[in-house]
């Protein structure tokens, strides 16, 4: 469950290391975002000479949450961190690599490019 002011790790090679959620998209008073939801983020930490700079405002999709997600069979998948992948204006990832596992729920949300780049899909 990601909400405004939540800090997330970046799970791609866009150059950003940490981002902060500044808005949960998808409704006028929507409070929480889960895996597969698009959020508006600002870059808080970035490596030098990267595609994104500190202070940039971007869209991102949540790929891992500590809160976890419940599957229809009753199982729950939780991760050790909250992580997101930075998107461009066309809802495509700006990075060429994804780090760490992602969940199958991204397939339902039409993020096939992220699933194909990910090393592991749970």
Swiss-Prot record:
What sections of the sequence does the record tag as coiled-coil? none
**What SUPFAM superfamilies is this protein classified in?**
Ribosomal protein L14
Instruction: Give the record's GO biological process terms.
Output: translation
HAMAP family cross-referenced by the UniProt entry: Ribosomal_uL14
Q: What does this protein do?
A: Binds to 23S rRNA. Forms part of two intersubunit bridges in the 70S ribosome.
The annotated subunit structure for this chain is: Part of the 50S ribosomal subunit. Forms a cluster with proteins L3 and L19. In the 70S ribosome, L14 and L19 interact and together make contacts with the 16S rRNA in bridges B5 and B8.
Q: What is this protein identified as?
A: Large ribosomal subunit protein uL14
Gene, per the UniProt record:
rplN
